[in-house]
Regions:
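Extracellular polysaccharide-recognition and catalytic grooves
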Residues: 181-250
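Extracellular glycan-targeting catalytic surfaces
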Residues: 1-199, 206, 210
Length: 250
């Protein structure tokens, strides 16, 4: 995990680098609208279906717009579509997008010039999921247990950004007790979900192991870290999948 000293060093590096300063401005611009108002946090879990998220006329994937939860545009014909299946397909990308916003806002709070508003919005996203996480049902899954999605590895990708945001806020001194409790709640349940579904020697299991490592660091759980890294299906075992040709094989 990042430390206070590392954050201070990065702030100095950003201040002294035109490229890093430009990158910081780009990230700030990308999140400007989120700072103005909180995007909709879906009240539903994502659903994988044959027709959800696709144009019924030409089969093209509908455009993801985080600010349009109910109307979804086909990039080919321009028609707008609505309905439960389209909304739940949209929810997959929205959940992932919100976690990305949370961690980028936390980075702005830890490294930027205007930390207050970015930290507050990031914490608001974390707390909202803390309040709702157990309300997302662990059902209608395709590959393993999940509350927000239909596959465990997606939950793993999501929790990595979620915990990344929390860790940055904590080291920046911007993680209040209520937000910390929300993060604890989500991380504990995510560990149970992800930990019970081992996909063996699989590319998806690398995401699961990475997520369990992040959770282990958050809770300072050495046993969980050891399992995610050193078990028969841990990260080290997956690294052995690299062959002499540089490719990785399941």
């Amino acid at each position: 995990m990042v430390t206070v000293e590392q954050l201070a060093a990065r702030r100095e590096a950003i201040a002294g680098s035109p490229d890093l300063t430009a990158l910081a401005r780009h990230i700030a611009a990308r999140n400007a609208r989120v700072l103005e108002r909180l995007p909709l946090v879906p009240e539903v879990k994502a659903l994988l279906s044959v027709d959800g998220g696709r144009c019924p006329d030409d089969g093209r994937a509908l455009v993801f717009d985080p600010w349009s939860p109910d109307e979804h545009t086909c990039p080919a014909c321009g028609r707008r579509h609505a309905g439960v299946r389209h909304h739940r397909a949209w929810a997959k990308f929205q959940h992932l997008w919100l976690a990305e916003r949370a961690v980028e806002l936390a980075a702005l709070a830890a490294l930027g010039n205007d930390p207050g508003s970015a930290a507050a919005r990031s914490a608001e996203i974390l707390c909202t999921y803390g309040d709702r996480y157990f309300g997302y049902p662990n059902r209608d899954n395709v590959l393993g247990p999940s509350r927000l999605f239909f596959s465990t590895y997606l939950e793993s990708i999501w929790i990595l950004n979620y915990l990344g945001a929390a860790a940055l806020l904590r080291e920046a001194g911007a993680l209040d007790d209520a937000t910390a409790r929300a993060v604890h709640t989500v991380a504990d349940e995510a560990a149970n979900l992800i930990g019970e579904y081992d996909e063996g020697f699989s590319n998806r299991q690398t995401w699961n192991n990475a997520a369990l490592c992040a959770i282990a660091v958050w809770f300072e759980d050495e046993d969980l870290a050891r399992r995610a890294i050193q078990s028969e299906t841990g990260l080290v075992a997956h690294l052995r999948g690299y062959r002499d040709d540089g490719l990785w094989y399941e």
